[in-house]
């Protein structure tokens, strides 16, 4: 009987110490991303060093959104992709030092691929660029350099501008 009491006196403190350690080991630390959107990286080529760039997103059924507001001397930037639509339509407004603005509409066609990291985190959408079209007021051409849009910060689209006149 005396041995049972001694055993229980030692078991209870040991259990109180071991229980939190076991509970912490059972819990997983999950760092979910704050946003579920990934971005398309645009790199500008040509004579845009002195220009100012504004980019608007045209969303059917809603108001336009300013994504980039008066970026001075643009060389590259990242714009988040929509994850519900099969295309994103952007309006590029390039203003030179004399105040002349040239506007182009760029349409990016893509697939939306859900990407799951953990059941505790919301799905992210990766994208595959399939086609890009543009008007040609300031933009000469757009080339898909890397079609897969994911966590990597690589240049996905290369935008070539007409030379200044």
Each PLM stretch: what is its role?
Residues 36, 71-75, 86:
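Ser/Thr- and Asn-enriched, surface-exposed coil loops between beta-strands
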Residues 44-46, 57-61, 94-99:
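Short acidic, glycine-rich loop/turn motifs
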